[in-house]
Amino acid sequence: MSTLEQKLTEMITAPVEALGYELVGIEFIRGRTSTLRIYIDSEDGINVDDCADVSHQVSAVLDVEDPISVAYNLEVSSPGLDRPMFTADHYARFQGEEVALVLRMAVQNRRKWQGIIKAVDGEMITVTVEGKDEVFALSNIQKANLVPHF
C-alpha cells in the first residue's frame, strides 16, 4: 500500500465505519483520469444506496482534507466475487479459498501466483500452489484477489 493509500485509509475509515460498513480497502490508480476506488462491505451485503451514502460522506471528508493533488474520480463498490485482499485478516478470513497474487518482486522468477490460502502467520501468507506450499510476505504482494468458482 502506498503512502497516499495509507493516509487515505486513515482518513476515511472512521466515517465509513460510522455509517455501519467495513472498509475493505482502497486503491488509487494514477492515469490520465486518476481513480480512487473504495471497497466496502457489511454483513447484509452492499447495494447502490449504500455506495451512494459512503460516496457522499467520503467526498465531504476528502473535500475538506484535500489529500489528492490531481483530479480523480471516486468509485465506491462492494468487493465483488473476485474480492480484493488487502490485510492479513482478509487472508485469514478466506483461508481455504483460491487466491490470485501479483507480487512486487518475483519469487522463483515469478510475479504471478495462484493457489489455495493455507495459513496466515503475522505478515506471512502460505499459499498451496500445485501441491506445494509457498510463503509470501504480505509486503511483497502488490495485488491479490479471490478466484470465484461458479
From Swiss-Prot:
- Does this UniProt record's set of keywords contain Cell inner membrane? no
User: Keywords of this protein's UniProt record, alphabetized?
Assistant: Cytoplasm, Ribosome biogenesis
Q: What is its main location?
A: cytoplasm
Keyword Cytoplasm (UniProt):
yes
Family matches, as Gene3D superfamilies: Ribosome maturation factor RimP, C-terminal domain, RimP-like superfamily, N-terminal
Q: Where is the protein localized?
A: Cytoplasm
Pfam families recorded:
DUF150_C, RimP_N
- Provide the Gene Ontology terms for cellular component: cytosol
Question: Which InterPro entries does the record cross-reference, listed alphabetically?
Answer: Ribosome_maturation_RimP (IPR003728), RimP_C (IPR028998), RimP_C_sf (IPR036847), RimP_N (IPR028989), RimP_N_sf (IPR035956)
**Gene Ontology biological-process entries:** ribosomal small subunit assembly; translation
> What NCBIfam families does the database record attribute to this sequence?
PRK00092.1-1
Which family would the database say this protein is a member of?
Belongs to the RimP family.
What does it do? Required for maturation of 30S ribosomal subunits.
**HAMAP family recorded for this chain?**
RimP
Name assigned to this protein: Ribosome maturation factor RimP
Lineage of the organism? Bacteria, Pseudomonadati, Pseudomonadota, Gammaproteobacteria, Enterobacterales
